[in-house]
From Swiss-Prot:
Pathway it works in: Glycan metabolism; bacterial cellulose biosynthesis
Biological process according to GO: cellulose biosynthetic process
Species the sequence originates in: Komagataeibacter xylinus (Gluconacetobacter xylinus)
Entry keyword RNA-binding: no
Name the UniProt record assigns to this protein: Cellulose synthase operon protein D
Keywords, alphabetical: Cellulose biosynthesis
Functional note: May have a major role in the perfection of crystallization, involved either in the pore structure itself or in the organization of the pores within the linear array of terminal synthesizing complexes (TCs).
Record bears the keyword Transmembrane helix: no
InterPro entries recorded: BcsD_bac, Cellsynth_D_sf
This protein's encoding gene: bcsD
Amino acid sequence: MTTLNAKPDFSLFLQALSWEIDDQAGIEVRNDLLREVGRGMAGRFQPPLCNTIHQLQIELNALLAMINWGYVKLDLLAEEQAMRIVHEDLPQVGSAGEPAGTWLAPVLEGLYGRWITSQPGAFGDYVVTRDIDAEDLNSVPAQTIILYMRTRSAAT
């Protein structure tokens, strides 16, 4: 028997799974599920405690590099009581998602929410919202996802 050292490719499986989840559960349930998956992923590997946004950005990019999930830029928007999270190069699951190719975006909401609220001085009761209108998905070769993280009271 010949043993190959090739890594398995799960892209076909993930694409079929994405279609089935969307068809059977619907978009809202799918997004809730994927947010929970993101929170679970964040619990499996967490950044160290960071004292600055810049330091946190470096640590988050190191974690993202471990799983080849792109990179992030964090901006604290003091006047808006928010953090702008720009994630570049999100892996695609074919054309799945709304807009097409962004099926994994809700995972980022859970992932960043848990990572950021684990930091000193972070707010606990938060809302992560996606700014689809600001995402120019056709102008870049890789997916760009823009999220805003706000305290629940500032989001209403």
